[in-house]
């Protein structure tokens, strides 16, 4: 019995080695290329002459919306038979384009089919969808949700004008124009863009605004906001996260600084600061007993305030007890920036070159 078992093991081992050798021969004689071709995901290209609304229904793909090279709208993506990425379903009705995920069916036909699709992904992107909008055309509305809420660039909008948005994703805008709407962002960045009549909730994440204009915009619940060469029009309100040590860095273009009303304030809240640092107490004496050495705590508290530098040094900061305020009044101007915060560092200065 043992002899038969030994023979069976030897035969199995030899067969395995032979299989690996044959697979290697196939690999080095072009078999792997053929495997890629057979198992490649299906590329989908759709063209439309007229669209006014785009709805993207909670897909796991990154979305890239950009300017088209011709007068048509184009949608490009790839579906995989083996559903390593949930396949997409596309529908269009009366100018409304809808993208949604199909139910996964897992049609894997053996390890070689799976391997082939993995290899094919080197040249066919199954993780993103591209939507192209003709130059000079304006989308009436863009609605969308992404599974990759905190990922940089899960929604990229470039060289496109949109009248209204309703988005929940990580957002990157490049030379984009948004006229109205609401955005819930795990990450938000706008470069050379214009935002109007828009509310942004940053979910305690980062907001970056570079050479961008805000007009009647509210941005709330961010952890860090960096704005360089910012243009302010109309009434704009920034409200950082209340329960952490937030940072707001602002640098306005000269024209905006000369024509703006500023109302900036931050309040030191010891209890909230202590909770952010992991301490819970009822009295200040209890906090001192819990912390022991208060030097680190005091160092963090010193970061709370309004700080000016460069062209902003002439602006006066009023300090009273645990509150600091900076007010600049231009009665003839309709432009204003209001920042109301707790336990925040607010810097008005020209960014240091990297």
Predicted stretch roles:
Residues 1-5:
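Positively charged n-region of N-terminal signal peptides that target proteins for export
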Residues 176-181, 186, 190-354:
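Short, surface-exposed interaction patches in beta-rich subdomains
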């Amino acid at each position: 019995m043992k002899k038969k078992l030994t023979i069976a093991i030897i035969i199995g081992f030899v067969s395995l080695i032979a299989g690996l050798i044959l697979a290697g021969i196939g690999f080095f004689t072009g078999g792997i290329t053929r495997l890629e071709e057979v198992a490649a995901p299906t590329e989908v290209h759709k063209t439309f002459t007229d669209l006014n609304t785009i709805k993207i229904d909670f897909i796991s793909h990154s979305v890239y919306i950009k300017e088209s090279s011709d007068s048509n709208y184009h949608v490009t993506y790839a579906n995989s038979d083996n559903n390593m990425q949930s396949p997409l379903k596309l529908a269009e009705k009366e100018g409304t384009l809808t993208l949604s995920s199909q139910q996964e069916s897992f049609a894997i036909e053996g390890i070689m089919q799976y391997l082939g699709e993995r290899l094919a992904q080197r040249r066919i992107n199954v993780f993103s969808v591209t939507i192209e909008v003709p130059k000079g055309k304006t989308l009436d509305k863009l609605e969308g949700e992404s599974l990759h809420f905190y990922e940089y660039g899960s929604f990229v909008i470039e060289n496109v004008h949109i009248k209204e948005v309703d988005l929940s994703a990580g957002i990157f805008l490049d030379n984009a124009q948004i006229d109205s709407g609401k955005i819930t962002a795990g990450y938000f960045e706008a470069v050379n863009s214009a935002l109007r009549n828009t509310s942004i909730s940053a979910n305690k994440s980062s907001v970056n605004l570079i050479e961008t204009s805000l007009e009647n915009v509210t941005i709330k619940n961010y952890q860090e906001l960096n704005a360089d060469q910012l243009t302010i029009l109309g009434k704009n309100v920034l409200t950082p996260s209340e329960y952490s040590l937030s940072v707001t860095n602002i640098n306005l273009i000269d024209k905006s600084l000369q024509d703006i009303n500023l109302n900036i304030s931050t309040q030191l809240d010891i209890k909230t600061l202590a909770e952010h640092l992991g301490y819970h107490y009822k009295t200040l004496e209890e906090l001192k007993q819990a912390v022991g050495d208060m030097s680190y705590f005091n160092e963090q508290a010193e970061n709370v305030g309004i700080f000016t530098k460069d062209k902003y040094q002439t602006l006066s900061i009023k300090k009273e007890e645990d509150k600091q305020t900076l007010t600049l009044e231009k009665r003839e101007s309709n432009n204003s920036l209001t920042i109301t915060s707790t336990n925040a560092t607010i810097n008005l200065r020209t960014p240091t070159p990297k």
